[in-house]
């Protein structure tokens, strides 16, 4: 490919030695000086035919470019580093194995949860305070009212609160060693009863406020 004055080429981007731009003007000056010296020494020795022949002009180097630039055959591909292949992504970490202490802690937590649920079930069956909405007319106190009140009461088992007397009484009754009085049977365990009460107020059908003391329970306990 011929190199022109206005054509940008990839060769201009290569590195060039510093001595080649100054070499060509020096050679041209030496050739001109040689021709002047030869003409001054023997002006008549040259024929008219030889005068018309121009002096030989040294051809510039093959890698010389106009404007004092020197071109070197090089490849941009050699200057560029080769493309690197993308690195494969590391595999995701697998699930960590559960250590024996963690497994033991999990088993203990499960047993503790079972015990706590069992204790909650026992507490639900035990003596405790409960509440329910009931009509005033169903209280049996002779009041006529269309209102509903929250009636709190005690219920549940007191087997865990039995004393040695209660345990012995139950054993004697079961074995038939103790004759119970006719028409009644001794109670071999305490009873779940209110230990505190509160007053309840409501309005009757005549728009009159009524208050009943010690009507609703506020605390429960095993008595007897």
From Swiss-Prot:
Cell compartments where the protein resides: Secreted
GO molecular function: glial cell-derived neurotrophic factor receptor binding; growth factor activity; receptor tyrosine kinase binding; signaling receptor binding
Region annotation Disordered: where it falls in the sequence: 41-124
GO cellular component term, pick one: extracellular space
Glycan attachment positions: 206
Reported function: Growth factor that supports the survival of sensory and sympathetic peripheral neurons in culture and also supports the survival of dopaminergic neurons of the ventral mid-brain. Acts by binding to its coreceptor, GFRA3, leading to autophosphorylation and activation of the RET receptor. Strong attractant of gut hematopoietic cells thus promoting the formation Peyer's patch-like structures, a major component of the gut-associated lymphoid tissue.
Descriptive protein name: Artemin
Organism the protein comes from: Rattus norvegicus
This protein's encoding gene: Artn
């Amino acid at each position: 490919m011929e190199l022109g004055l206005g054509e940008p080429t990839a060769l201009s981007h290569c590195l060039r030695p510093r001595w080649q731009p100054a070499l060509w003007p020096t050679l041209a000056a030496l050739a001109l000086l040689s021709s002047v010296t030869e003409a001054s020494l023997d002006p008549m020795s040259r024929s008219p035919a030889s005068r018309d022949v121009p002096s030989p002009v040294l051809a510039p180097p093959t890698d010389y470019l106009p404007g004092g630039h020197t071109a070197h055959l090089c490849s941009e591909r050699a200057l560029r580093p080769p493309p690197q292949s993308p690195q494969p992504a590391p595999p995701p970490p697998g699930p960590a194995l559960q250590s024996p202490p963690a497994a033991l802690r999990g088993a203990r937590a499960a047993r503790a949860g079972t015990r706590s649920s069992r204790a909650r079930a026992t507490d639900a069956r035990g003596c405790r305070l409960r509440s329910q909405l009931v009509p005033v007319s169903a209280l049996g106190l002779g009041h006529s009212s269309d209102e509903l009140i929250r009636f709190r009461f005690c219920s549940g088992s007191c087997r865990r609160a039995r004393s040695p007397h209660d345990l012995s009484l139950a054993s004697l009754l079961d074995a038939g060693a103790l004759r119970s009085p006719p028409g009644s049977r001794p109670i071999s365990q305490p009873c779940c009863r209110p230990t505190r009460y509160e007053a309840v107020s409501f309005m009757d059908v005549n728009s009159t406020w009524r208050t009943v003391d010690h009507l609703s329970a506020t605390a429960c306990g095993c008595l007897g």
